[in-house]
């Protein structure tokens, strides 16, 4: 059962996702999951997965061979684990609690067919910085920038 801060949102008749005030998803995650459109044989990794919306949509819509979601926030990983358990998806989606900057050696190199990332939109020093680690890291480039991956 969801706590006061947590709630579930339906993704299909028999599929729901746990969200919280700090870990919600928007239409851009839905568009990104569809844009990537994995095939059944693909091995997929979503970096900065948050509450796991992209891996869940990949599983719901495409059923790729393997799905991994990497996330820094412990509270987001807890939501993802709760979602996986209550939807009986633990064998299909593997959550990895890790800082992207420390990922080398944790996941194999040149292994995944699809790697997605929906990075923060605000560069350091711009905009109003949200309070709280989860809000701050999800919306500002404190722990991840696009330049790190280029």
PLM region spans:
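A generic local structural motif
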Residues: 2-4, 18, 82, 102, ...
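SAM-dependent Rossmann-like transferase core, predominantly class I methyltransferases
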Residues: 3-43, 49-61
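Residue-level signal for pocket-adjacent positions within structured domains
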Residues: 6, 12, 95, 135-137
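General secondary-structure edge motif
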Residues: 12-16, 96, 129
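Residues at secondary-structure transition points
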Residues: 27, 49, 67, 71, ...
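Short, contiguous clusters of charged residues that form electrostatic/catalytic patches at enzyme active sites
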Residues: 27-34, 78, 98, 144-148
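Conserved SAM/SAH cofactor-binding pocket of Class I
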Residues: 35-117, 122-128
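Mobile active-site "lid"/loop adjacent to the S-adenosyl-L-methionine
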Residues: 119-149
């Amino acid at each position: 059962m969801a706590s006061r801060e947590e709630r579930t949102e339906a993704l299909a008749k028999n599929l729901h996702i746990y969200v919280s005030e700090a870990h919600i998803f928007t239409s851009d995650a839905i568009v990104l999951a569809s844009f990537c459109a994995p095939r059944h044989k693909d091995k997929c990794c979503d970096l900065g997965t948050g509450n796991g919306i992209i891996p869940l949509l990949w599983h719901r819509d495409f059923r790729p061979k393997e799905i991994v979601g990497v996330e820094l926030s412990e509270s987001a990983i807890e939501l993802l684990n709760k979602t996986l358990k209550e939807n009986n998806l633990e064998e299909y989606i593997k959550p990895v609690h890790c800082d992207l900057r420390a990922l080398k050696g944790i996941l194999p190199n040149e292994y995944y067919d699809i790697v997605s990332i929906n990075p923060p939109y605000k560069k350091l020093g711009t905009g109003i910085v949200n309070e709280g680690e989860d809000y701050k890291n999800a919306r500002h480039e404190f722990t991840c920038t696009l330049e790190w991956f280029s």
